[in-house]
Amino acid sequence: MGGDTYGFGGVNRIRTVNVSQEEADFASDSLADDLPLLCCRHYPQASSFVSVLGVCSGWLGLLAPDLFIFVLTNILLSGFLILIAFRAFLSLIGAFARRTSKASEKDKSPPEVLSAAGAQTLPHYSVLVPLYQEAASVPGLVAALEALDYPTDRLDVLFLTENDDTATRQALLAQLAASRSLQTRAQILTLPDGMPRTKPRALNVALHRLAGGLVTIYDAEDRPHPDQLKRAAAAMQAGAGNLACVQAPLYAYNAEESWLAGQWALEYDVHFGLILPALAKFGLPVALGGTSNHFRVSALRRAGGWDAWNVTEDADIGLRFARMGERVGVISPPTQEEGPETLRIWVRQRSRWIKGYIQTWLVLMRQPVLAARQMGVLNFVSGLGLLSGAIGSALLHAPCLVWLLLCLLSPEVGLAPIGQIVLIAGYAVSAGAAGLAPNRTGANRWKLIASFWLYWPLLSWAAAIALYEMLRAPHTWAKTPHALTRQTPQSVQEAFA
């Protein structure tokens, strides 16, 4: 492992480190070696229960196909109806919690809100920034990190780069040279070639280097609220000992640039504005976002770090915390993100998400009885239900739309009453949740709601790609390109003034 310090203006301050192959391999394989049943490196085999259920279903399909279709359809529709009701409940609870939180914060001045994290008690904080082919995003990223309000003697920033990404490292060196506040706090780590080339592999390299305290992750396009670190530290200090992580809300700054970006932003507003706060309120498992989650380093290490082979390491670690008896909370200071504006970018990102959800589902169902015992039955059903719903709805949106069109065009084809209920309830609950969610972007909310039915079938396209990649390239990370939007993000000071 070699390192250099780059000097500018006669002062040597920016440290670069070449990560050894041994260290990188350990980051890739440590979870698989220590907790193999919780890692998706080796294709998870279904449990005996799932295998028996599959065999019985296959025999029923062969012996009585009409009965099989009837039973399967009603089971699926009933499951979706229960899930829709659960999401409606979470949306209402999330809306109430949000209004209560806003009211309580209005009664406090900023110093009082942050009093639990006084200047003398703030823990050491590490900020991890995994980057690949992100040279164009570096100037805005560095400006956003400079704006973070946290004592400089207790803050480290680790930029994680890949061996073949010289352009991003050069951009970092140039920007950091002009940043007096980051020069002494920043390190640039270069990972050697190796498999898998994923974000969690890079994060694990950094995790094993941290001294302790708290750690958070920001992506290249992120613009976090300046108070986010202090608020997270305050939440950790005020929370119970089993509070492993707090999640900050994410929202798109470019929601008005395209219809797809608007729909993506609306999903985020519902997810981070309603669903996650409700799950956290009841202590239910939370599939974390990929950025702006703030962890206790000790909790991450007890969990074995991130799964380097899972392409949605965020969802996976959230469910693993639940299996350990750890909880996830939420904080209010948000992070701006760049939403995908084109179909090509959206499909690449969404297919990776669905592939990762499938990987996470397979790990959870590898030993479902053990998982239920570890998490508690309610937590297990909640986590499994939301994960299954995300995968199942993505797979079925387009086929259901085709079936609905057939029902409308052909009198011979009828839609069962339970199907009608699921269809109406699904749209009604989604529209209601969208109306209750915070509109952080200023996009025309009702135009987006009216076009839900055009957006949802696209999920089936992404799901089909995810299934194909599960067979051909399960651990390949489809990178989402950034810095492509025509809309320039506001400066951090303008955005959160």
Label every PLM stretch briefly.
Residues W59-V113, A117, G385-A473:
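Membrane-embedded multi-pass helical conduit in multi-pass membrane proteins
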Residues P123-S126, D156, R301, D316:
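Cell-envelope/extracellular polymer assembly enzymes that use nucleotide-activated donors
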Residues T16-L53:
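Cytosolic-side membrane-insertion boundary helix
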Residues G318-Q336:
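Catalytic donor-sugar/metal-binding loop of nucleotide-sugar-dependent glycosyltransferases
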